[in-house]
């Protein structure tokens, strides 16, 4: 078909064909190689390819590929969380997170999300919820460890085994063991308590298709506090073959504040919205709100080089 004539799309289809024939998506040399090639192929952002306008055959392939990526990512996190949790009792697993292949990406993403959040909040959040935290809750860990030293993180996941592994990661840390709390529940069953959080993160892998993603967002809108911030992961350009896209039209009941598309090796785009009904704050077409003061953590801030900071400011300028 015509929409498959693009060379890059052909490469993605070929990789999908190979991945879909794998007997297992658990970490192995073959699995790691194929997904590594897939990510590298999908990273370029200087393309005019719009995955939402492709033919139905490619759209169906993309939907299946996103599910395969999510399954493989879950196995990868489970694998490394198990290894880290099995370290000797006198070792803190959080001191060895660098063994996870994509840890540096989470450091960058955490820094990016903290900076974006600080642009749209006048106070430091005291309680944050992360929905879909998984067996290796790296976003919560990075934010708690490097950026928000006094914030409590409530991590929600439907999988009790994932929460057990995640809890083992932080149980030996004198600080995070007190500030990381885990809840085993389906977010769609969580009706009470969601209004306690200043910020709610919705993981990219919660809602692997448009219908289920919108359903999760609608549920959060119904139960979050007015004025609370919702942070979501989306995808842009070819990266949308790896993760679902969150559009502004999906955010009914929220004021869209920012959509930021990284151009480096951070795959996910970041979407920030505010639940309507709270104090009025400028959105994507207005001026920014007050910035709360970040913690003095130069170690992690050094992760973002000057070029990365410049790109971020330019992106803000384009949005505004």
UniProtKB/Swiss-Prot annotation:
InterPro entries hit by this protein: Nicotian_synth, SAM-dependent_MTases_sf
PROSITE patterns according to UniProt: NAS
Key words, A-Z: S-adenosyl-L-methionine, Transferase
Record EC number: 2.5.1.43
Induction details: Constitutively expressed.
Catalytic activity from the UniProt record: 3 S-adenosyl-L-methionine = nicotianamine + 3 S-methyl-5'-thioadenosine + 3 H(+)
Top-level division of the source organism's lineage: Eukaryota
Name the UniProt record assigns to this protein: Nicotianamine synthase 1
Species this chain originates from: Arabidopsis thaliana (Mouse-ear cress)
Highest classification ranks of the organism: Eukaryota, Viridiplantae, Streptophyta, Embryophyta, Tracheophyta
